[in-house]
From Swiss-Prot:
GO terms for cellular component: cytosol; small ribosomal subunit. GO terms for molecular function: rRNA binding; structural constituent of ribosome. InterPro entries: Rbsml_uS13_C (IPR027437), Ribosomal_uS13 (IPR001892), Ribosomal_uS13-like_H2TH (IPR010979), Ribosomal_uS13_archaeal (IPR019977), Ribosomal_uS13_CS (IPR018269). Keywords: Ribonucleoprotein, Ribosomal protein, RNA-binding, rRNA-binding. This is Small ribosomal subunit protein uS13. Located at the top of the head of the 30S subunit, it contacts several helices of the 16S rRNA. In the 70S ribosome it contacts the 23S rRNA (bridge B1a) and protein L5 of the 50S subunit (bridge B1b), connecting the 2 subunits; these bridges are implicated in subunit movement. PANTHER family: 30S RIBOSOMAL PROTEIN S13/40S RIBOSOMAL PROTEIN S18, SMALL RIBOSOMAL SUBUNIT PROTEIN US13. One of its GO terms (biological process) is translation. It comes from the Archaea. Belongs to the universal ribosomal protein uS13 family. Part of the 30S ribosomal subunit. Forms a loose heterodimer with protein S19. Forms two bridges to the 50S subunit in the 70S ribosome.
Length: 148
């Protein structure tokens, strides 16, 4: 534990070496605190250790788990893309792949003219919120003062 690094690169993202490992991993898009803790436990690492003390072998182990978490023993319900639309596999996407998958999902919904796709096109709320008072766009009309 002598070699401390202030910046640790995991899955193409620079992590803060001064933070606890589980909190440092949340800097990777697509990884929350619960998933980060699971990755630490599966890798056999202490989630509370400083990320700067990771060795290269431990970083490789974390990257392997992130590449295919279900194969390494992380439960299926914890992944962010169970039963993927194209492949049918349980995937956990991170960084740019996650952004692309979300964009493709929205484009597919728009292409098939699903209700959610149309709401995305129009820039309206997708999940059933009311729109009478919120989600208003455009110029606001000011209130004129009463003359004395």
């Amino acid at each position: 534990m002598a070699n401390f690094r202030h910046i640790v690169r995991v899955a193409g993202v620079d992590l803060d070496g001064n933070k606890q490992l589980r909190w440092a991993l949340t800097a990777i898009k697509g990884i929350g605190i619960n998933f980060a803790t699971m990755v630490c436990r599966v890798a056999g690492l202490d989630p509370f250790m400083k990320a700067g003390y990771l060795t290269d072998e431990q970083v490789k182990k974390i990257e392997e788990i992130l590449a295919d978490p279900v194969a390494h023993g992380i439960p299926r319900w914890a992944v962010n893309r169970p039963k993927d639309y194209e492949t049918g596999r349980d995937l956990h996407l991170i960084t740019a792949k996650l952004d692309m998958a979300i964009r493709e999902d929205i484009m597919r919904l728009r292409r098939i003219r699903a209700y959610r796709g149309i709401r995305h096109e129009l820039g309206l709320p997708v999940r059933g919120q009311r729109t009478r008072s919120n989600f208003r766009r455009g110029q606001t009309v000011g209130v004129s003062r009463k003359k004395k």
